[in-house]
Amino acid sequence: MTAGRPGPVRSDLQVVLPAWITARLLVAAAWLVVRLAGPGGGGVPRPVERGLLAWDGDWYQSLLVHGYDGVSVEGVRFFPGFVLVGRLVDAILPGGPGVALVSLANVSALVAAVLLHRLVLLETGNRAVARRAVWALSLFPPAFVLVWAYGEGLFLALAIGVLLCARREQWWTVALLALAAGLVRPTGALLAVPVLAAAWRPGVGSVRLPARIAAVVAGPVGVGIFVWWASVHFNEAFIPMNVQRSLRGDPVNPVRRLVDGVGELFGGEALGDGLHIVAVAGLLVLLVVLFRNWPARYGAFAAACLLVGLAADNLNSLERYALNGVPFVLAVATLASRRRLGPAVMAFSAVGMPFLAAMAWWGSYVP
């Protein structure tokens, strides 16, 4: 086995498990800090009372137990993939729906990290960079949701699987994984961007054309299947998007939204949308690093995810949407490989991730 090729899964786990465990210890520390801080004022319980089922986790649990007809119409904005797999886990794992969803989220995050390790090894042949990428994913500030009962872990496992299989030109496997990703998160539609770039490189011609076409369209098709079903079931066209729009506002020009956000840094929203703009600034730096150091398809996917996140009046959860654009962590790994920046980058992540988790459990940050 050469130094740059992945070996058995056991060797991947030796790299991944320390980062995976560390992330969960940091999230546990954040939970403990918020719990020790006491209950919320005015008798209103804080999200910390819900533990790993806080925020969207409650929605996913309700959907698993009651289905879309058993929750308010707002629930239709959550795509069904995570819930459907959660039901399978619940059928075989004791402990109830909450345990099933949390277990699925955490195991999926572990799988995502293993696949990322293999992807970076395949792209770079550099085990040090692959290890840093795993740590970057595990400690990426919004990655605390990979510990909670959120669908991000499952989506990332599928999305990284898409990128890995596209790199290997396993187009039918890409199509299957992308279709599943589209049923987990609407961001699955954006997987068409990196897959298209990988499938239609110069000189490829028409070899295996049906498989490559299927790979490109599978993500949007997965999203479309649920949107079609929900539209028919609730007798309202595009109802998942309409519900999401009612919460995040109408689509806006991303550039204009960014300019407006800069002004919010100095107004009453300095601790609200203003902080999201600071995050955007950091993500733009990562985007430049990504385009300069990695194949363009990764930068294109990350850029598409960021643009979609910015194309809304309400920027809540923007950082989590950026996490779906998983190549951002490749840029973090690149920066962490530089001697002067490495310690600062990892220290920022090690502080930022539990800080955001604590803010979310406190109720002052929407994950």
Regions found by a protein language model. Name each.
Residues L104-S108, L122-E123, R132-L164, A180-L191, ...:
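Multi-pass, polyprenyl lipid-linked donor-dependent membrane glycosyltransferases
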Residues L88, S103-E123, V285-L286:
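Transmembrane-helix motifs of polytopic, lipid-linked glycan transferases
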Residues S138, L290-A312, Y321:
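Transmembrane alpha-helix segments characteristic
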Residues G51-G95, P254-L258:
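Short hydrophobic/aromatic helix or loop-helix immediately within or flanking a transmembrane segment
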Residues A23-P39, G43, G51-L53, A192-R201, ...:
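Membrane-lumen/periplasm interface segments of specific transmembrane helices
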